[in-house]
């Protein structure tokens, strides 16, 4: 699972996930990509499930880049616990995703196979996303 090796602080505040992505919003190395259309939060299990779906469909022919990393700790109190007694322990690691953020990139296969594989991967993610190419990446969400 993806998670930081060490952090300066164990827990973080929730924060807000507003606006559009400015960083990570354009293709860096690949020819095809999966771009977020709406805001959401992705955890390490969802990233791994999508990555496995991608690699199995392309049968390891393509080069795949994961452009997101869950570095925000999410805490959760156990069931049937009364309020108070401090902030709960870290349950999982997540990353806030803004619209326009590139999630996965892919190169080395034709567009049809890449579209099929990335469509399989987008069904594993908890927010709407779309397939983009180098030519179509600058379109409005």
From Swiss-Prot:
Per UniProt, the keywords (alphabetical) are: Ribonucleoprotein, Ribosomal protein, RNA-binding, rRNA-binding, tRNA-binding
GO cellular component assignments: cytosolic large ribosomal subunit
State the Gene Ontology terms under molecular function: rRNA binding; structural constituent of ribosome; tRNA binding
A Pfam match: Ribosomal_L16
Q: Which SUPFAM superfamilies match?
A: Ribosomal protein L16p/L10e
Q: Which GO terms describe its biological process?
A: translation
Oligomer and partners? Part of the 50S ribosomal subunit.
Q: What does this protein do?
A: Binds 23S rRNA and is also seen to make contacts with the A and possibly P site tRNAs.
Q: Please report which protein family the annotation says this sequence is part of.
A: Belongs to the universal ribosomal protein uL16 family.
Protein known as? Large ribosomal subunit protein uL16
